[in-house]
Regions:
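Bacterial N-terminal signal peptides that target proteins for export
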Residues: 2-10
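Bacterial N-terminal signal peptides
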Residues: 10-20
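Sec/Tat signal peptide C-region and signal peptidase I cleavage site
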Residues: 19-27
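Short, surface-exposed binding/anchoring microloops in extracellular/periplasmic proteins
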Residues: 28-68
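Short aromatic-glycine-enriched beta-strand elements
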Residues: 68-74
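Beta-strand/loop nucleic-acid-binding surfaces
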Residues: 82-95
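Short nucleic-acid-contacting surface segments enriched for D/E, G, S/T with interspersed K/R
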Residues: 92-107
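OB-fold/S1-family single-stranded nucleic acid-binding modules
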Residues: 113-129
Length: 129
């Protein structure tokens, strides 16, 4: 019985060793930054919001384009329900929003009356799933 068990374990280890090159290794820093909303700013990651334990958080930006105009908007809500929204017609930020992924870290600031004044997107390996 012991011999059969040893043979089975040996075969299993050999099999795992042979196929281990095909198994991806996930390493490195991983941050699931939750959403924070201040009086005139918001920051966080979409993944952090999505995988948070509450059902309140969201963050993201969108782009509206047609033949005559384009503008961006960003919105966020933290775990307490505090929300933030801003918009901009600044054409430089269209490129920034287009570079955004579901793993991007987003930091956005706005004036009190709504226009975005700063938009930072950080695409970094620590923000990947």
């Amino acid at each position: 019985m012991k011999a059969n068990l040893r043979k089975l374990i040996g075969t299993a280890v050999l099999g795992l060793a042979m196929f281990s090159n095909d198994i991806p290794a996930w390493a490195g820093q991983r941050l699931l930054t939750e959403v924070t909303v201040g009086t005139s700013s918001a920051s966080g990651t979409m993944l952090g919001a999505r995988y948070s334990t509450d059902k309140q958080q969201y963050i993201g930006c969108w782009l509206y384009e047609n033949r005559s105009e384009e503008f961006i908007g960003c919105a966020a809500q933290d775990k307490t329900g505090k929300s933030f929204i801003c918009y901009s017609r600044d054409p430089r930020w269209v490129t920034v929003v287009k570079a955004m992924t579901d793993s991007s870290y987003i930091s956005v600031e706005a004036n009190a009356n709504g226009p975005c004044t700063s938009l930072t997107i950080e695409n970094h390996s620590s923000h990947l799933r």
